[in-house]
């Protein structure tokens, strides 16, 4: 009796994408032209022309390195784009300038003091660009000869022939270099570089002259020109690290492991002083340069009087980044005191700040922001639905209307629709309450909730 082999069907799993859509993932920059004039709609930014122009001036001063140790406060009502302006500045600065964003409540921890958390945030925002020159050998591999001992034991020896367009040289190889060449699968026709100090081999690709060696090649195969000039060259390598990373590595044995685990703990001031002295020495010798970055503290009114006192002192340091703060508070109590102050910030710190104010969005700007968010979230919406959603945003809040986009899209897909209509918006609006309707509901049914007002005369104290 013939038996049939069962065919195993491979299981296919959906992998959730890591790239999530955040509240400010549509921001690409500040949307300014070369003359620092803001465009009405550009790079995900809408409206707030005066605030964006002011942020652009600050941005230029940061890029020129002329404003280190300064502080800027972005103040405005909730939902007026304060964090968006800060994120736009971070995008415009690029990856070379360190940008650290924290919330005011993040510094309160049981593991470390408030001043230590602020110091680490300051040090993360200051970069050090270290330059070093290395000698490399760069050329096209002509031939690799490896002589193995006849007995099978003993050290391997060999010869490596490299060439450029102007010269050709034979190098003697030791055991470790042979192992490196074997590991990298180097063969004739490859263009490689060898770091003379470390012996590290890097494959740059295959030479164009060897393009016809094989009929079929993988997509990862890259063809490059044969190097010209001398085989041995001096190359300048630039490393950019933050002062905090140097602190952590030098704070303990195998401190570099703490960079990955995040368990940095408190770092002694003596370690930081030694690092500051060494960095100053490198700067005088021309080996390194300081890059003043940006520290952004959102919800700055959550800091207490001790933190504000520390910020006053830290901003006077010669190694201080640009400090950008954001708050949505008016005249309120300074945390840790009984005194009131504008934005909940002490007057002596307010004197040091350049204050940028933001204003509420009008109907046209609100509609444009909602359209940008729909594009970011891949949601198709009819013009009437945009109008209804804009009206909801003006009557309630911009954040609430933005949160309805994804919910309305899901309702639309459930009814097999391709475009979000007014009925979808109305349905999610009735399902999810905004702040004002929720407050009204609480007022109507407050007696039905627990712990509303406990009446002492009904309690049995016997």
From Swiss-Prot:
**What keyword terms does UniProt attach to this protein?**
ATP-binding, Cytoplasm, DNA damage, DNA recombination, DNA repair, Helicase, Hydrolase, Nucleotide-binding, Nucleus, Transcription, Transcription regulation
Q: Which residues bind ATP?
A: 76-83
E.C. numbers: 3.6.4.12
Question: Molecular function terms in GO for this entry?
Answer: ATP binding; ATP hydrolysis activity; DNA helicase activity
Catalyzed reactions: ATP + H2O = ADP + phosphate + H(+)
Question: InterPro entries in the record, alphabetically?
Answer: AAA+_ATPase (IPR003593), P-loop_NTPase (IPR027417), RuvB-like (IPR027238), RuvB-like_C (IPR041048), RuvBL1/2_DNA/RNA_bd_dom (IPR042487), TIP49_P-loop (IPR010339)
Can you cite a GO biological process for this protein? box C/D snoRNP assembly
Note the Pfam families from the entry: TIP49, TIP49_C
User: Looking at its record, which EC class is this enzyme?
Assistant: hydrolase
Q: Could you tell me where this protein is found in the cell?
A: Nucleus; Dynein axonemal particle
Q: Name one GO cellular component term.
A: Ino80 complex
The record lists its disulfide bonds as none
Q: What is this protein's function?
A: Has single-stranded DNA-stimulated ATPase and ATP-dependent DNA helicase (5' to 3') activity suggesting a role in nuclear processes such as recombination and transcription. Proposed core component of the chromatin remodeling INO80 complex which exhibits DNA- and nucleosome-activated ATPase activity and catalyzes ATP-dependent nucleosome sliding. Involved in the endoplasmic reticulum (ER)-associated degradation (ERAD) pathway where it negatively regulates expression of ER stress response genes.
Per UniProt, subunit arrangement is:
Forms homohexameric rings. Can form a dodecamer with ruvbl2 made of two stacked hexameric rings. Is a component of the RNA polymerase II holoenzyme complex. Component of the chromatin-remodeling Ino80 complex. Component of some MLL1/MLL complex.
Q: Which family does it belong to?
A: Belongs to the RuvB family.
Which protein are we looking at? RuvB-like 2
Source organism (scientific name): Xenopus laevis
